[in-house]
């Protein structure tokens, strides 16, 4: 058995089996996940995965340094790219997020150290989530969302942040009968915690 959502496409199966929930500590990979989740706003994750390589090409292999330096010419280039999500507002937001990401790195040493301090460096296994009872947001994603917005990040509401935390492994939301659930618990430090829902 596996998480129910994984079987919708080849891209979703690969993403579930190889990436989703695996603790991630490389800053550029964290920026990639944050950008993908932010670009997803109002869209399906399956669509984002289908367009992932286009997004990678448009956003300089998800290099925050390069994206932060994008100009109006780059925005025009992206808008004219085939298969791209053509939202000027989102594209500008990703450039702003890259700038905020670099500022946070400078302040905290790395985005990794900033993010993982919220869980003391451990993957969080919320009680009940392994049964498939996952919220769209919780108190943790509310707190991180609030802090990111204060730092100038855009498209980082609590629902998007919750999905980001699932993606980068800070939250292990695989279902208990999914092989990945126990595999990740055996391979990485984790902590079982009681869910606290946001208001």
Q: What residue ranges belong to the model's regions?
A:
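HhH-family (HhH-GPD) DNA N-glycosylase catalytic core used in base-excision repair
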Residues: 1-199
């Amino acid at each position: 058995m596996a998480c129910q959502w994984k079987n919708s496409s080849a891209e979703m199966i690969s993403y579930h089996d190889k990436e989703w929930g695996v603790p991630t500590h490389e800053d550029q990979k964290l920026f990639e996940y944050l950008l993908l989740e932010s670009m997803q706003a109002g869209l399906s994750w399956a669509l984002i995965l289908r367009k992932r390589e286009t997004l990678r090409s448009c956003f300089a292999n998800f290099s925050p340094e390069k994206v932060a330096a994008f100009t109006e010419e780059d925005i025009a280039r992206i808008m004219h790219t085939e298969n791209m999500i053509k939202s000027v507002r989102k594209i500008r937001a990703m450039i702003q997020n890259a700038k905020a990401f670099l500022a946070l790195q400078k302040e905290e040493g790395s985005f990794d150290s900033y993010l993982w301090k919220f869980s003391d460096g451990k993957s969080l296994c919320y009680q009940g989530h392994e049964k498939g009872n996952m919220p769209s947001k919780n108190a943790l994603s509310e707190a991180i969302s609030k802090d990111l917005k204060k730092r100038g990040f855009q498209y980082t509401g609590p629902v998007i942040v919750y999905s980001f935390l699932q993606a980068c492994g800070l939250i292990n939301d695989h279902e208990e009968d999914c092989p990945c659930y126990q595999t990740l618990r055996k391979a990485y430090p984790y902590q079982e915690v009681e869910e606290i829902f946001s208001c």
